[in-house]
């Protein structure tokens, strides 16, 4: 499976960005924020020019078309997601611990409203699920890569004897993925601030029912470590 890690977490050699590159990144930061709340279809050269108080011709120098702008915005959203969600989970050991870390960093990213409109990819998925074309294809590729990443860690947990042999790791990943998506929906639409705690409880319940004694020890040690970290 090609998971989210295939899109890279390593840092390139740091160099000072050119003025044009810096401007390009600043434009995309605003574009991502607009698209998260108003949708990628609501994002246009004109809408962005209005927000940035720039000329349309100036923006056309960076993006030749609306589709090009949308694809660049998706790539910026992917980069932010990697920084906010994927990279913080990577120091955790493969398997159950990393799966937990990935889910917690994802919940935290939604809860903290890193994007003005909530989870960028949840919104983009709902917007483009039935629309053919390059933008829809890229949304599907990126969201599937994240789900594949969760599936891979669940499979790794089973290989490490942390999950029961009868556990379906693909189903488990599907379930925990759905819990976070539901928390995002309940918070954004219903303003339900308890949705994240419910999602955490649901994830714990599913994991505890699927783990082996070895996996339960891993969960217990991790829970104790997190409590100590919070108390400091």
Which residues make up each language-model segment?
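Polybasic, lysine-enriched low-complexity intrinsically disordered terminal tails
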Residues: 1-11, 214-232
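Basic, helix-initiating cap at the start of DNA-binding domains
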Residues: 1-38, 42-51, 68
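Hydrophobic alpha-helical segments that form the core
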Residues: 4, 117, 122, 166-186, ...
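Amphipathic alpha-helical packing segments from all-alpha helical-bundle domains
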Residues: 82, 97-100, 133-159, 171-174, ...
């Amino acid at each position: 499976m090609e998971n989210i890690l295939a899109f890279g977490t390593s840092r390139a050699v740091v160099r000072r960005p050119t003025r044009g590159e810096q401007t390009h990144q600043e434009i995309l930061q605003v574009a991502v924020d607009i698209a998260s709340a108003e949708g990628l279809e609501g994002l246009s050269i004109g809408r962005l020019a209005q927000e940035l108080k720039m000329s349309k011709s100036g923006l056309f120098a960076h993006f030749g078309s609306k589709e090009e702008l949308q694809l660049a915005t998706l790539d910026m959203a992917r980069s932010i997601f990697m920084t906010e969600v994927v990279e913080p989970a990577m120091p955790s050991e493969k398997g159950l611990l990393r799966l937990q870390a990935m889910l917690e960093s994802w919940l935290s990213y939604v809860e903290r409203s890193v994007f003005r409109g909530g989870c960028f990819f949840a919104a983009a998925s709902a917007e483009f699920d039935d629309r053919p074309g390059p933008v829809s294809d890229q949304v599907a590729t990126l969201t599937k890569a994240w789900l594949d990443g969760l599936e891979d860690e669940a499979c790794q947990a089973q290989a490490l004897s942390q999950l029961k042999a009868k556990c379906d790791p693909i189903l488990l990943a599907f379930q925990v993925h759905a819990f976070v998506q539901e928390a995002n929906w309940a918070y954004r639409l219903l303003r339900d601030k308890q949705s994240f705690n419910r999602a955490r409880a649901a994830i714990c319940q599913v994991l505890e029912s699927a783990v082996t004694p070895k996996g339960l020890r891993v969960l217990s040690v991790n829970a104790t470590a997190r409590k100590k970290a919070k108390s400091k």
